[in-house]
Swiss-Prot record:
Transmembrane parts of this sequence: 10-30, 51-71, 92-112, 143-163, 195-215, 231-251, 263-283, 316-336, 347-367, 398-418, 446-466, 475-495
Organism: Shigella flexneri
Organism lineage: Bacteria, Pseudomonadati, Pseudomonadota, Gammaproteobacteria, Enterobacterales
GO molecular function: (R)-carnitine:4-(trimethylammonio)butanoate antiporter activity
UniProt record similarity statement: Belongs to the BCCT transporter (TC 2.A.15) family. CaiT subfamily.
Protein name, UniProt field: L-carnitine/gamma-butyrobetaine antiporter
Catalytic function, reaction form: 4-(trimethylamino)butanoate(in) + (R)-carnitine(out) = 4-(trimethylamino)butanoate(out) + (R)-carnitine(in)
Pathway involvement of the protein, from the record: Amine and polyamine metabolism; carnitine metabolism
Gene responsible for this protein: caiT
UniProt-listed HAMAP family: CaiT (MF_01049)
Main location: membrane
InterPro entries from the UniProt entry: BCCT_CS, BCCT_transptr, BCCT_transptr_CaiT
PROSITE patterns according to UniProt: BCCT
Pfam families in the cross-refs: BCCT
């Protein structure tokens, strides 16, 4: 019994360093918010301007890697000897469900406004050209390219899970073929795992920082409760307590049901927006945007704007590529685990087609609705953002739809459930990654899960206290830098091991 408790306890070398690092950074930030904002702006400017090109080349190289997997020697290799665990329809649905987070609802509703008001390629703000490129850029940032990069990492993790039969809960476990067992399980592997965990903590705190204002703004619209930072903190605290109760009382089945409800409600809400907003315009705008994407794709791939220095690729493309990089390992592990028994080609094609369809539907419907509301002068987004913040502007794009009260209730429930499942997933992932030998199907210790959910909640509150999108963008970019190298090492380790051990 003692031995079992020891096995499921924390792993000090990957538990305490991230905890201490993140705790110190939060303390320094809260101590002087103005100084923290100065540092944040400097970090954002340095990384995006000096190293933005590296993120763009990373995505392009990983895209070529996707083609190599689909048409190369491993295309017909099966990831495990068992038949697929899920039907193709269920598999695709699970992929869609993974895309319906509150952060996705945040960006899907407001992103097009930023692209139109501060457009790329020297276009005039709010011009016809800017509007024509608005949705096309969303389809670029949330389309086949990033999902192709995830395909490569998902194949790598599925290979280590189901072909090599490895227990992978941290990235260092996959680096034995590349770095050797001594280094992968030694100091080098510990450093890699700590980079991963610090970045993941900030990424999850960022998602909470995006999701919480949506819920509190919904509460203000529905119940008249003023949206304040204190209310944000109270709501985050309630989510943490609710998560602790669910875990302590064995209500994980309830959380899974909530996740399913979130997915079905997402379909319902998107269908409603599509019908009442203007189905004909949405389909025409989407079709035109696909054409614009194909026409501008080469420039989008390599756009760094070093001459005009307008800042668009740094503020958006590099930011989003860092976003994809920082979530790559966590997301790829999930996608790999639900893809047992499929061939490499099936996994690559299924991910790119299924997940691209998911994100394209979300961004097309929500972005088109926002554009229509702007063009018809139904809402004034710049004024809303200036007076009340981005979250209020997003809420108003939903409140402007017919049957506004019912629509807002649906959106409120969707955001609330999405954030409950987010906090649960955050605490579970971090607890699994910082505990010793917690195998698949086992639960990490309750106190560890609660502790991590509290820390993620604190980060969300700190980012909200800083105000604006720049702190959130900087947290993602800073976290994406070390994981940029970790993702590359995992990929190279897979290639090296597969060449030696995955032969006919």
């Amino acid at each position: 019994m003692k031995n079992e408790k020891r096995k499921t306890g924390i792993e000090p070398k990957v538990f305490f360093p991230p905890l201490i690092i993140v705790g110190i950074l939060c303390w320094l930030t809260v101590r002087d918010l103005d100084a923290a904002n100065v540092v944040i702006n400097a970090v954002f400017s340095y990384v995006t301007n000096v190293w933005g090109w590296a993120f763009e080349w990373y995505m392009v190289v990983m895209l070529f890697g996707w083609f190599w997997l689909v048409f190369g020697p491993y295309a017909k290799k099966r990831l495990g000897n068992e038949p697929p665990e899920f039907s193709t329809a269920s598999w695709i649905f699970m992929m869609f469900a993974s895309c319906t987070s509150a952060a996705v609802l945040f960006w899907g509703s407001i992103e097009i406004y930023y692209y139109i008001s501060t457009p790329p390629f020297g276009l005039e703000p709010n011009s016809t050209g800017a509007k024509e490129l608005g949705l096309a850029y969303s389809l670029f940032h949330w389309g086949p390219l990033p999902w192709a990069t995830y395909s490569f990492l998902s194949v790598a993790f599925a290979y280590f899970f189901f072909v090599r039969k490895m227990e992978v809960i941290r990235p260092s476990s996959t680096l034995v073929p590349l770095a050797g067992e001594k280094h992968a399980k030694g100091l080098f592997g510990t450093i890699v795992d700590n980079f991963y965990l610090v970045a993941l903590i900030f990424a999850m705190g960022t998602s909470l920082g995006l999701a919480t204002p949506l819920v509190t703004e919904c509460m203000q619209w529905l119940f008249g409760i003023p949206h304040t930072l204190q209310l944000d903190a109270i709501i985050i605290t309630c989510w943490i307590i609710l998560n602790a109760i669910c875990v302590a009382c064995g209500l994980q089945k309830g959380v899974r049901i909530a996740s399913d409800v979130r997915s079905y409600l997402s379909f319902l809400m998107l269908g409603w927006v599509f019908i009442v907003s203007g189905a004909s315009f949405i389909m025409n705008y989407f079709t035109d945007s696909v054409g614009m994407l194909l026409m501008y794709l080469p420039r989008m791939l390599f756009y760094t704007d070093p001459i005009a220095k307008g800042g668009f690729p740094q503020g958006w493309t590099v930011f989003y590529w860092a976003w994809w990089v920082i979530y790559a390992i966590q997301m790829s592990i999930f996608l790999a685990r639900i893809s047992r028994g499929r061939t490499v080609r099936e996994l690559c094609f299924g991910m790119v087609m299924g997940l691209t369809a998911s994100t394209w539907i979300l961004w097309t419907v929500l972005g088109s609705n926002t554009l229509l509301l702007m063009d018809k002068n139904i809402i004034n987004i710049p004024n809303l953002i200036e007076q009340y913040g981005v979250a209020r502007a997003i809420i108003e794009t939903w409140a402007a739809l017919p049957l506004s009260t019912a629509t807002m209730w649906g959106f409120f429930i969707l955001c609330f459930i999405a954030t409950v499942t987010l906090v649960n997933a955050c605490s579970y992932t971090l607890a699994m990654s910082t505990c010793r030998e917690v195998r698949d199907g086992e639960e990490p210790p309750l106190l560890v899960r609660i502790g991590w959910s509290i820390l993620v909640g604190i980060i969300g509150i700190v980012l909200l206290a800083l105000g604006g999108l720049k702190p959130i963008q900087t947290a993602i970019i800073a976290g994406g830098c070390p994981l940029f190298f970790v993702n590359i090492m995992v990929t190279l380790s897979f290639i090296k091991d597969a060449k030696q051990n995955w032969k006919d």
